[in-house]
Amino acid sequence: MAVAGRRLASVAEITVVRAGVERLDELVGFWKLLHRHQSSVAAAVPGLDVLSESDSSVIVGKMYREWLSGPDSFAFFAEEDGRLVGYVVGFYDEPHFMWSTGRVGHIDSFYVLPELRGRGVGRLLMEAAYAEMRQAGATTVALEMVANNDVARRFYEREGFTTTFVQMHRQLAPD
């Protein structure tokens, strides 16, 4: 299933296409790009240890395979002239046990190649994710990001996201 492509200013036609488990290697390849970016951003966050790219990729590959083999997740690629330029992976949760949110769609992984940022590729991927979530009955979209990732924060705020929770971490010393 292809989501309608659009001609964007200064960008050839971008097409958003569904990615299933049959494209797992490509999804993990994009995870590696996201991991490198997140690792560089996270380096400035005290106490946030990052798994190696290889260890993380094995875990994410298993997670994506499990998710995409079931009904409660999705993945999309953005393509420009047959070249992959971005991706989004998400999943669904039932309503929160305390907050009146309805079914929740989660953006787990989202990445656009740096040279295409600011040209509408991310917006097209998010529109595909929102449409998928609406179809699955989600009424809210949630995501997490590294606290000091100001570029991502600005993008998500332009997309209408607001900060509702703060996740905190503390390192435990060994006994």
What are these regions (language model features)?
Residues 1-29, 33, 40-46, 175:
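Conserved N-terminal entry element of GNAT/NAT acetyltransferase domains
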Residues 35-63:
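Conserved GNAT-fold acetyl-CoA-binding loop/helix
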Residues 57-77, 106:
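A short helix-loop-beta-strand connector motif used in the catalytic cores of GNAT acetyltransferases and
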Residues 77, 83-92, 106, 111:
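Conserved beta-strand in the GNAT
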Residues 78, 118-126:
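Glycine-rich acyl-CoA binding loop
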Residues 94-107, 117, 138, 164:
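A conserved beta-turn-beta hairpin within the catalytic core of GNAT-like acetyltransferases
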Residues 113-115, 119, 147-148:
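Active-site acidic-Proline motif in GNAT/NAT acetyltransferases
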Residues 123, 127, 135, 139, ...:
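Conserved active-site alpha-helix within GNAT-family acetyltransferase domains
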